[in-house]
Regions:
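N-terminal cap/leader regions of alpha/beta-hydrolase-fold enzymes
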Residues: 1-277
């Protein structure tokens, strides 16, 4: 069972700043990004949601550190430490939509950023204990976590509200977020190594379509654990119709709150998969 943060009010999502995070540039696959590192223990790559490493992402990062992980957060977009809702956030999202590394509108896409993230995962695995690393993707980056698991170093992919490709058509909404060639590697790892993943979404979230989860569930079967939180009108916990960020903005550290319980499950999953032999 994971502990509550005593500094967070029950009615607020956990947040943090960059205190204690060490920045270092990492270059791979033709890209260079600053990467923020903190903690000791098995490694977890935490890929930020749009519009970047905001205080909610850092709150999640600190929670993982407190639970015994080494966490690295690549700054793929935005201004690290800046608020999620701020002037300039829309411009960050627009740039993301046209950046070739993200291929935001492409189906069956082998995204260039996935190659960078695999290299980052391998590097983290070499520097941390345990049999491999976890990768958490959120929102824009949600599907990147599964694409990263093409590399054998990734043992615990977590897809939180995966939003790419942007759901313009039924084909886009049903797309798994990675190429067929990449998905075949995941299939093989599931069959031969017992790889498994967790996917999280709110039931009414149009940005993380249910059709995408259906595609992944049909393909991966029991290896894809789905956590879907009820956000229908009148739901018991008062989630709004646009509830989206399962592990950050919607978490309230109260037992029984679904996003809080989902975060507990993610930590449990990481510990199960990454425990040193």
């Amino acid at each position: 069972m994971t502990a509550r943060n005593p500094d967070v009010a029950a009615g607020a999502a956990p947040e943090a700043d960059l205190t204690g995070w060490v920045k270092e540039a990492f270059t791979a696959s033709g890209f260079t990004y600053d990467v923020y590192r903190k903690g000791e223990g098995p490694g977890v790559v935490l890929i930020p949601e749009m519009p970047g490493i905001h205080p909610g992402v850092l709150g999640l990062g600190n929670h993982l550190v407190d639970n015994g992980f080494t966490v690295v957060i690549p700054s793929l977009y935005g201004t690290p430490g800046a608020k999620a809702v701020r002037p300039g956030a829309v411009a960050v999202m627009v740039r993301g939509c046209v950046a070739k590394e993200f291929s935001a509108f492409a189906t069956n896409a082998d995204r260039p950023i996935a190659h960078y993230l695999r290299a980052l995962a391998r590097d983290l695995n070499e520097k941390t204990p345990g049999p491999g690393v976890g990768v958490i993707g959120e929102c824009w980056s949600g599907g990147f976590a599964l694409a990263a698991a093409v590399d054998d170093s990734v043992l615990a992919p977590v897809l939180s509200q995966p939003s790419l490709p942007i759901g313009l058509t039924a084909k886009h909404r049903a797309d798994p977020g990675l190429s067929e060639a990449e998905l075949k590697v995941i299939d093989r790892r599931v069959a031969e190594e017992g790889l498994c993943a967790i996917g999280l979404r709110f039931s009414e979230d149009p940005l993380a379509p249910g059709a995408r989860f259906k595609t992944l569930k049909n393909r991966l079967g029991d290896a894809f654990e789905v956590i879907e939180i009820n956000s229908k009108k009148g739901n018991e916990h008062g989630f709004g119709k646009m509830a989206h960020s399962v592990l950050t903005l919607e978490v309230r550290e109260v037992d029984g709150q679904p996003a809080y319980e989902a975060r507990k499950r993610v930590v449990e999953f990481l510990k199960e998969r990454l425990a040193p032999a």
